[in-house]
Amino acid sequence: MKTAAVVMRSPEDLCISSLELDAAGDSDLVVDIDYSGISTGTEKLLWTGRMPTFPGMGYPLVPGYESVGRVVSAGAHAKHRVGDAVFVPGARCFGPVRGLFGGAAARLVVADERVFDIDASLGESAVLLALAATAYHAVSGGGKRHPIVAPDLIIGHGVLGRLLARLTVAAGLPPPTVWEREPARHAGAMGYEVLQPEADSRRDYRAIYDVSGDARILDTAIPRLAKGGEVVLAGFYAEPLRFDFAPAFMREAQIRTAAEWQRADMLAVKQLAESGRLSLEGLITHHERAEHATGAYRTAFTDSACLKMVLDWRSCQ
């Protein structure tokens, strides 16, 4: 069984290829993908070649961890059934080609326990669930740390920053301030204010959440903290982070790293989205057929007006 898939052969060398899929086992599903999202964080680092080395890293690879589709075959031990709408956070099913994280393909073979059933009415917006779960994890800490202070300042008004702000408002907490340097990204706020950093004079923030991925952000954020305040690093940083110690010492600043989402985070945001408490509207700005993936990835990574690019795989099946 073959599938069309996005393959990064090396940095900035991307194509659609026909790949042989691994055989499905008794606990596996075969899923036909309708839509997949392009990540401007992790996938951009893979595309540019700036991704820090980690176990399993290497080219060629199939990217993607934001895919939605329908089950077309289910193993005897699988709980999902044919016809179920599911979210797939990636797969490793391409033989010698690495899945990092393997979601950008027309068809996937994936372990039943790895996927999440979704309300089909979410449609293409369901590709945003991984980012929503990432935002949720930043403020929930996987339920392993209490208390966690919700953001009163968010740095970055991309999709992750918007979802973090929307989750804060949906929880009934005071609306956060959001910093964004790109004027074109100031639009789209839902119940909170977006400012240029220079227009904000506050220096008493209790919790600053950075989703910009700017490795120089600590020297910008720490002087804006109240004493005992916290900076949460919720982006992904390709370069080493450094900071001036004296301002951090004077404020007794805390620095916390938020890692990848866990299953409980996904279940929580799925319920919020399906109930309508968390809006996913207005976040997908660009669409492209999967056959045109080369141009779509370049647009996603170079056009500041592109918040989220979605590939449509339906014509490839």
Predicted regions and their residues:
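Glycine-rich beta-strand-centered segment in the early N-terminal region that forms part
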Residues: D22-I38, R50-R92, S121
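NAD(P)H dinucleotide-binding glycine-rich loop of Rossmann-like/cofactor-binding domains
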Residues: V86-I155
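N-terminal Rossmann-fold NAD(P) dinucleotide-binding loop
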Residues: G161-R162
